[in-house]
Amino acid sequence: MKASLLKKLDVLSDRYEELTALLGDAEVISDQTRFRAYSREYAEVEPVILAFRDYRKVQADLEGAQALLKDSDPELRDLAEEEVAEARGRLAALGDSLQRMLLPKDPNDSRNVFLEIRAGTGGDEAAIFSGDLFRMYSRYAERQGWRIETLSENEGEHGGYKEVIARVEGDNVYAKLKFESGAHRVQRVPETESQGRIHTSACTVAVLPEPDEQAAIEINPADLRVDTYRSSGAGGQHVNKTDSAVRITHIPSGIVVECQEERSQHKNRAKAMAWLAAKLNDQQQAAAQQAIASTRKLLVGSGDRSERIRTYNFPQGRVTDHRINLTLYSLGEVMEGAVEQVIEPLLQEYQADQLAALGD
């Protein structure tokens, strides 16, 4: 393990001892805010320190076994060689585990998300593919045990969506979907194509973490224009009676959000405001993400929405993720919701990149 990482672990060990003392301090115990904060930090640090103690113990065992290699007794030397080999294997495994524990954690990983899918080039076929992508992510959400609800939709003339916005709720949603943002290209023969020619269309996907109240940008009500209108979505006769749909325009940024899925104007407004907060947060963080990506030459995680990240080729049954040069011939399974076949290699590549930069 790199010396710089061992130094970080030594500093973390000192902090662990400090936290242990603080949590036993009567003054801290009486202050629930501080006590909760220290308890959370302690819970995060403790597994790392316990693993580090195991690492140091195995390191000492290795040094002891190596010293016995110089012994005059051949049997003892043979035994020492076995112990050295075993200790080196354990040390390597513990070192790998510790490095992963030290990887910087994305504070958004545990958050719910807003999923935006928009048809790009390709007209009707792009809208149809937007519908296919939404179905793919909906199936994936079901497989993960997540809840997905549509906030806004603009249907295409021949099926699919010109635009569809959904909120996805569950465990570690952003952690698994954060690399889906970008341009998704489809190559296939449209149903309306009589001569069997392959057409290329594209859609854009954006995945925005839903900020909590503490993380959300403070929005000045004076910066908002709120319009209400009659919902064009589901709801039977109700949609013709009340202006329950809500459209909110953030005047300084020009961002517009709308929600029409609930029968209650109040609920639609609350969901639209949450979506607006996510978009404003995303806009603020985009520049920082781009700076990090360009500095470290990252392709995975650059967050560039215009970047073509994936191609779905139906005639060949192929899906290709261009960021990591991954090609799979299981397009049917992926479109039915087995998106983990692409997501898992992306996460592994990103983690490998983080590990490479860890000791810098």
Curated annotation (Swiss-Prot):
Gene3D superfamilies: 3.30.160.20, 3.30.70.1660, 6.10.140.1950. The modification N5-methylglutamine is found at residue 237. Methylated by PrmC. Methylation increases the termination efficiency of RF1. GO terms for molecular function: translation release factor activity, codon specific. It holds the Pfam family RF-1. It is found in: Cytoplasm. The keyword Lyase does not apply. InterPro entries: PCRF (IPR005139), Pep_chain_release_fac_I (IPR000352), Pep_chain_release_fac_I_sf (IPR045853), Prokaryotic/Mito_RF (IPR050057), RF-1 (IPR004373). GO terms for cellular component: cytoplasm. The keyword Protein biosynthesis applies. Keywords: Cytoplasm, Methylation, Protein biosynthesis. Belongs to the prokaryotic/mitochondrial release factor family. Peptide chain release factor 1 directs the termination of translation in response to the peptide chain termination codons UAG and UAA. HAMAP family: Rel_fac_1. This is Peptide chain release factor 1. It comes from Pseudomonas aeruginosa (strain ATCC 15692 / DSM 22644 / CIP 104116 / JCM 14847 / LMG 12228 / 1C / PRS 101 / PAO1). The gene is prfA.
